[in-house]
Amino acid sequence: MTTREYDYIICGAGSAGNVLATRLTEDPDVTVLLLEAGGPDYRFDFRTQMPAALAYPLQGRRYNWAYETDPEPHMDNRRMECGRGKGLGGSSLINGMCYIRGNALDYDNWSTHKGLENWTYLDCLPYFKKAETRDVGPNDYHGGSGPVSVTTSKPGVNPLFEAMVDAGVQAGYPRTDDLNGYQQEGFGPMDRTVTPKGRRASTARGYLDQAKVRPNLEIVTHALADRILFDGKRASGVTYLRGSERATAHARREVLVCSGAIASPQLLQRSGVGPGAWLKELDIPVVLDLPGVGQNLQDHLEMYIQYECKEPVSLYPALKWWNQPKIGLEWMLNGTGLGASNHFEAGGFIRTRDDDPWPNIQYHFLPVAINYNGSNAIEMHGFQAHVGSMRSPSRGRVKLRSRDPNDHPSILFNYMAEALDWREFRDAIRATREIMRQPALDRYRGRELNPGADCKSDKELDAFVRARAETAFHPSCSCKMGYDDMAVVDEEGRVHGLDGLRVVDASIMPIITTGNLNAPTIMIAEKIADKIRGRQPLARVDVPYFVANGAPARNVAKAVRQPETV
């Protein structure tokens, strides 16, 4: 057994862990050990580096933990996919590369919780900007010198993107030029974490590339954290496995858990921090009975509303193996072409009811009919909208199955457990159909493939959701930040009741944000990094942002085609 000592030990080299490793080692006298259970982010592997290949990492286990849920009771008892990234970059190595920060009111809502007053949108915005380099340059809402490369949608891409945005506007919803700027609500182009050379902009590329040469950072891959060690109530180190070899590292200052919304509560529970009754079931000595560890689990659920495309402009030919060598060669040599995009270049956020204070539904538009993980491709030209609700009231949990770090935990999201979930998904399907029947899509829109034009009643729509809805791969909130009885960490990520231990990743969100989670997770890590370093927080950015204040969710009077009656 080997033993080493560092100032900080970080468990997990993902969207948050790489940020902390980079920022903490900017201080040359601070030593950091970064542990990652997966391997390197091999830059020659097109599966993780080519944006268009985003489905491939989800189809294996080299880069994907490939978790599976317990039977979901409201989803026909299906065991559902829960992919999480494994390797330097974590889930930023296998995600869909959509750069969505969330709605300003997400953070303003967090700040209404006791003790979280410094998590308003205007407090968070400087850290979003700090992390970002946007290809069209900085402005009041965007950064120009950060580690994360953000690419905007360019004119001349697939005509279906513009048509779908125009259709949303024709249906009476707003147009927005920037889903991460003044107004998230509406339809418009989508920013993506892609480099100017057409490569995936993971946190391994953006952050670790600048930090890994520092002598005060040690990165150990294929290192599976087993347990956090404690000296009384103070975290003192970590034991981890590399193959059959066990090693121990000691932390002079802090242990930072950045393993994500599934593995962070799993590691805490295995270390004796969690609901006491759960730990005793597995004969784990209780360091601290902390009931919220693994509770409050949230995710985004989504459906694919698919249509036949009457004109041959979809990405369907690119799915054929005989066309892929040319696409790959152009990407490899020039960083251009179909391989250089994730093809989520347009989307939007809407409110389905006037009394929704901010958007409750997200759209990703895709010019092909296929599942996110690359399965169930429709054998024809087609297009689809990925549609899902943003802030489900349903809550799940992550619970340890055994003390073996190689065993996956029991995961139950408890999808669709509340009446509001069903109302929002029915609303989403019907709103999508109204968008798709607008004139902008007339030349492209063929028959509805899924759910199918005959699927109309509440009962039929509900059956479709139960059978076909899938995860958007956004698990979060399982070690929530706050000060109520179920909170796990305080406003700086420090675990309640313990010293020298923080959790910093998407698991500490008190409520899931409106949109994809990579950008908010990076922001959280940037913000807490300043706290760890004892630095003054960045000054608030005093910019305006859109608030609906009860305005109609949709201007039906301006809709080009009025709603159909059901």
Swiss-Prot record:
Domain of life of the source: Bacteria
UniProt catalytic activity: choline + A = betaine aldehyde + AH2; betaine aldehyde + NAD(+) + H2O = glycine betaine + NADH + 2 H(+)
InterPro entries xrefs: BetA (IPR011533), FAD/NAD-bd_sf (IPR036188), GMC_OxRdtase (IPR012132), GMC_OxRdtase_N (IPR000172), GMC_OxRtase_C (IPR007867)
Record GO biological process: glycine betaine biosynthetic process from choline
Keyword flag Transmembrane: no
GO molecular-function terms, A-Z: betaine-aldehyde dehydrogenase (NAD+) activity; choline dehydrogenase activity; flavin adenine dinucleotide binding
Cofactor: FAD
UniProt xrefs under PROSITE patterns: GMC_OXRED_1, GMC_OXRED_2
EC number from the UniProt entry: 1.1.99.1, 1.2.1.8
Residue positions binding FAD: 7-36
Segments of this protein annotated with the region Disordered: 180-202
Top EC class, one word: oxidoreductase
One Gene Ontology CC term in the entry: membrane
Gene3D superfamilies: FAD/NAD(P)-binding domain, Glucose Oxidase, domain 3
Pathway where it operates: Amine and polyamine biosynthesis; betaine biosynthesis via choline pathway; betaine aldehyde from choline (cytochrome c reductase route): step 1/1
Record: active site: 474 (proton acceptor)
Protein's UniProt keywords contain NAD: yes
Keywords carried by this UniProt record: FAD, Flavoprotein, NAD, Oxidoreductase
HAMAP family: Choline_dehydrogen
Known role: Involved in the biosynthesis of the osmoprotectant glycine betaine. Catalyzes the oxidation of choline to betaine aldehyde and betaine aldehyde to glycine betaine at the same rate.
Family: Belongs to the GMC oxidoreductase family.
Protein name: Oxygen-dependent choline dehydrogenase
